Amino acid sequence: MKKQRRDQARPRGAAKERALGLLAVRWRSRAELDRRLRRAGFDPEEVGSAIEDLESAGLVDDARFARELVADRADRRLAGDRAVRYALRAKGVAEDVAAQAMEAAGDEAERALALARKRAGRLAPSEPEAAYRRLYGLVVRRGFGPSVAREACRQALREALPEAEEPD
């Protein structure tokens, strides 16, 4: 099958078909669909029309997309608020929609502690300083703030390695 060149005329509704194909893989935000369809060479007017049709059919919903993304990143992957907000911004979710979705994320300190507890048991009890540094680095890389990460790591290591001295 030949690939269609970008400058050739496309059949009416091709943008909508492509968008449906993208949505069949996973939920996407309005901005993400717009970017992908324009990059594929579709006319901006056709892209806008296709996305509006999909929104009216309930297949494109930024609020639902944001809630799903927050649930995935915050609850299942145990990511911090900064990482989740960054992901929402990268997907083109509006700030007000992102803020509403973030309300359901739960307590960031609890998520940081859950992540730290999950990993603390794997660390060597003979080297508490190294264990703290490794655990702290992991928690911060997941998007938690330094103070939240510090407290979560200290508590998780106290529980996992009670005989070790607490790092400074």
Which residues does each predicted region cover?
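An alpha-helical, amphipathic repeat domain used for nucleic-acid recognition
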Residues: 1-168
